[in-house]
Amino acid sequence: MVGSIEAKSLQSNGSVHHIGLNLEEKLDEFRRLLGKSEKDPLRIVSVGAGAWGSVFAALLQESYGGFRDKFQIRIWRRAGRAVDRETAEHLFEVINSREDILRRLIRRCAYLKYVEARLGDRTLYADEILKDGFCLNMVDTPLCPLKVVTNLQEAVWDADIVVNGLPSTETREVFEEISKYWKERITVPIIISLSKGIETALEPVPHIITPTKMIHQATGVPIDNVLYLGGPNIAAEIYNKEYANARICGAAKWRKPLAKFLRQPHFIVWDNSDLVTHEVMGGLKNVYAIGAGMVAALTNESATSKSVYFAHCTSEMIFITHLLAEEPEKLAGPLLADTYVTLLKGRNAWYGQMLAKGEINRDMGDSISGKGMIQGVSAVGAFYQLLSQSSLSILPSEEKKPVAPVESCPILKTLYKILITREQSTQAILQALRDETLNDPRDRIEIAQSHAFYRPSLLGQP
C-alpha cells in the first residue's frame, strides 16, 4: 500500500508521532459521528477517475490509508479503456524519469508490463494503470497506488461516503444505476460532488438542475446529505502539495465535520452554506474559461486583453447568479479565486487556446485524449438554452421592450455561436470584447444586484 502514516507525518512537519496521532483522532472523531463500530471501517468510494477525482482519492489514501482497520478507500472507473501507443510511450518516459516510481513498480513486480507496452507488445488499460497510480488524464503526475474497482455495484453498495468525480453529463445516468444497488440500504450515505456543470429542463418551467440535484433526484438521498466541494484547485498542483483552499458547501450537519476531516496542511477546506451559488459558479467558470483560453491565444497572452475579458465575463457570471439566487454568495475570496485559476489554467482554458491556435478542432468533440471531458462545452449549451427562454424575459434599463436574459450576456452568446452552432470562428470572441456598444461591466453588476431580475423558478422553486 501507500507509504506509512509516519512517512506522511514526517513530510508535514517532522513530528511523526504528533501528526500521526492527529490524523487518527480526526478519523476516530468522524467515525464516531457516523456511528461506526470498532471493527467496521469507514468506507469511501470515488466514482469516476478523472484528474480531480483520482487526486481526491489519492489525498485521502495518503492521509488515512495507513489505518487499515479503520479506513478503506476505493475508486471506480469503467473497464475496457485502452491506453494508446503514444500515451504508453510517454508514460514509460515518466516512469524512468522518477527513481521513486521506478523502484515502486519494480518492488510491486509491475514494471515489465510498461516495458512491453512501450515496445508495442502489450496493451495497457486505464483501470490497470490507475492501480499503479497513473491517471490516464494526468500521466505526468504519478499518484499513490489505489484500489480500483470496475464493478459499480461492488464499489458502492456498502459505501459510507461516495465522491462524485464524474462529469456532469454522466452524473445522472451513473447515479440512477447506483440507486438500484441501494434499495435495501438501512443507512443513508453521504455524497460529495466534485462535478461542475448543469442540465437544463424546460418543463414545467425553464430551470436548471445542478449535479447535487441530479444525485438527489436519481438516488432519493436527502439533499442534506449531498454536498459540493469547490476550488480553487488544479488537480496536479494539489497532489504536488501546492498550497490550496477549497470550500465544501451544503447543510451544516455534514459540511462542518467534513471540512475538518478533509483538511490537510497544504489543502485547507472551509465550509459554506451557499450550495447553489458555488455549484452554479462551478459550471459557469468552465464556460468562460474556454473564452479566456481563446483570448490568450489570439492576443499572444496580452495581459490587458485578458483583464478586459475577465471584467466582462465575471460581470456576466454575477448577473446570472443573481437571476438564480436572491442573495448569492459574493464573487470574492475563494469563489473568485476558483474562477481566476480556472480562467488562467485548466483543461477548459487549454481547450479554448488549442481551438484558437488551430491545434484541435470542434469536430473532435468535447472529450479529448489526455485531458478528459471538457465540461465547459456542454455547459455553454445548457446556460444558453436556459437564458434564451422568452418566458424569463427581463427589461434592462437601455431596452424599450423585454428581452431574454441571454441578451445581457454577450460573451455567453458568442461562445454559443462558436462552440455549439459553429456559425462563428474563435476570432468572434475578440469582436465581442471590442464592441463599442458594450456597457461598462459595472452596469450589469448594479442591475443584477438590484434584485429586479431574480427568478426563483430557475431553480425549480415556486
Curated annotation (Swiss-Prot):
Disruption phenotype: No visible phenotype under normal growth conditions, but mutant plants have increased NADH/NAD(+) ratios, decreased levels of glycerol-3-phosphate, and produce constitutive high levels of reactive oxygen species (ROS). It holds the Pfam family NAD_Gly3P_dh_N. One of its GO terms (molecular function) is NAD binding. Substrate binds at K196, R347, N348. Induction: By abscisic acid and salt and dehydration treatments. Down-regulated by hypoxia. It is found in: Cytoplasm, Cytosol. NAD(+) binds at G48, A49, G50, A51, W52, G53, K196, A235, R347, Q375. It catalyses: sn-glycerol 3-phosphate + NAD(+) = dihydroxyacetone phosphate + NADH + H(+). The active site is at K285 (proton acceptor). GO terms for cellular component: cytosol. Its EC number is 1.1.1.8. It is an enzyme of class 1 (oxidoreductase). Expressed in roots, leaves, flowers and siliques. Keywords: Cytoplasm, NAD, Oxidoreductase, Stress response. GO terms for biological process: carbohydrate metabolic process; glycerol-3-phosphate catabolic process. Involved in cell redox homeostasis. Required for maintaining a steady state cellular NADH/NAD(+) ratio through a mitochondrial glycerol-3-phosphate redox shuttle. May function with the mitochondrial FAD-dependent glycerol-3-phosphate dehydrogenase SDP6 to shuttle reducing equivalents into the mitochondria for respiration. Belongs to the NAD-dependent glycerol-3-phosphate dehydrogenase family. This is Glycerol-3-phosphate dehydrogenase [NAD(+)] GPDHC1, cytosolic.
